[in-house]
């Protein structure tokens, strides 16, 4: 639940195959701690900017918190407390908003809730937050991601499961409710699909990078993934050739930023 600062030019540039450096070499964090989320911020000295944007936190157990960006505008080497985390919880997503975004939170069991960020009051840095989504009481459910929708006309919802299945759905398929509910089905979770691993807001101009736990990476065009109903199973996005392999990470990138970097794979 702590926040640290780092200038992008201080990060050593590497290739796509390089190992990278331990984050402890760049930030003054404990050796047993880990980075769970990061934000790219345009400026921390522009008063108008930092007083008109918010940092939105979401935790594994469904807690959400909104704090004015200004609260994080004074860098300290040892970091500052960004959110008070309850026992057995952790931050899984952090987004920056302008105060007028639609929020969608998804859980591992394939449900998602949509509400306006105005439903989350502004709190101080050390606050715990409020209930964003109610999880299933099965001991295994948890939040897998949170997205902030800025443009309802061009953005859609992309979800990906453990076994490499995924799909896009229209935002309007998710009815707007009050925060704290259980939400609606965002993917039909089966033994074949595995549990949900991520949710992303995407446009036709985006590419998707999918990395499985065995280290294989593919890139695919979001426009090649057809729009489907939110309660459907989706289509296979990546073939997992090794037994017990699963999707490890998914990220959204602009198409032009990856030209000639990673081979594109067709979607079944």
Question: What feature does the model see in each segment?
Answer:
Residues 2-268:
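C-terminal interaction appendages of subunits in large macromolecular complexes
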